[in-house]
Amino acid sequence: EYRGKVKKLDYRLGVGVTRSYYKQSGDDSYENYSFNPRLVLHYTLPGNSFVRWKSDISNASPSLGDLSAVEQIVDSLQIRRGNPNLKAYLRYHTELTYEWQKGIFYSNLWGAYDYQPNAIMDEKYQDGDKIVQTWDNQKDWQKLSGRLTLRVGPIKDMLQFSFTGGVNHYMSHGNTYSHTYTNWYCNAEASFNYKQFSLYWQMNTNWNNFWGETLSGGENIQVLVMYYTHKNLRVGLGAFNPFTDNYKQQTENWNKYASYKKTNYVK
């Protein structure tokens, strides 16, 4: 890694090398080398603020489980089968951050773009009277992300509030499918400290991920915790979702042959 500075601009340039090798009994081996460059530019602005740009390229390799051609029975209609022809692929990531702080006020604005051509993602197809679940190097997977964080505090070393709101937009392009999905989310926190007592509250909405044809849902939760500290002793009492009863976590698959939707509730 090389670091340097030109006036208010700091920069870092690095590169790594990754070797991927795998071989299964009775199959040909596969070996792949990839260069993983990364670049960071940090520009200091007037006051306590800056702009930072980061970009990197990394590689991803298939797991041995994904490569195995052994069939596993899922149910009476579906089987799971690996793909020994999977290849490693590259992941491109870039992000831009603006941060500002003055006194007890703080803000952070962040955006990112991810691009993964030939990404290894799930797919299903019909083979006779069975639905085959497998993996393949698909066309590409893309993600656009944005996030804003605002914070106030600590006020008189006792009270602090923060709020984060963001969005993830997924574009999953397979060899036989194409899906888009947008997820809005937020997070809020508040803390209060007085002498030996501390009170903390946190709220998260669902942060969902979409990969291939599968949506993996996050949790919408609230947490309330109270602490008492005396010297090296800390005693706490917490509650999960104390003010709501709408906990929900869901998983979906959007395949045209065998879609499903699972939802977990806590009452």
What are these regions (language model features)?
Residues 31-35, 90-94, 103, 140-146, ...:
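Residues that define the transmembrane beta-barrel architecture of outer-membrane proteins
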Residues 47, 59-108, 115, 133-145, ...:
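Outer-membrane beta-barrel signature, preferentially recognizing the C-terminal barrel domain
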Residues 111-120, 132-206:
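Gram-negative outer-membrane beta-barrel transporters
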Residues 2-4, 17, 39-43, 86, ...:
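Residues on the lipid-exposed face of transmembrane beta-strands in outer-membrane beta-barrel proteins
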Residues 1, 23-32, 64-72, 77-80, ...:
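Outer-membrane beta-barrel translocator domains and adjoining extracellular loop/strand segments
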Residues 59, 228-267:
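C-terminal beta-signal and adjacent terminal beta-strands/loops
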Residues 1-28, 32-42, 158-167, 185-208:
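Surface-exposed extracellular loop regions of Gram-negative outer-membrane beta-barrel proteins
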Residues 6-9, 44-48, 91, 101-105, ...:
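Outer-membrane beta-barrel channels and translocator barrels
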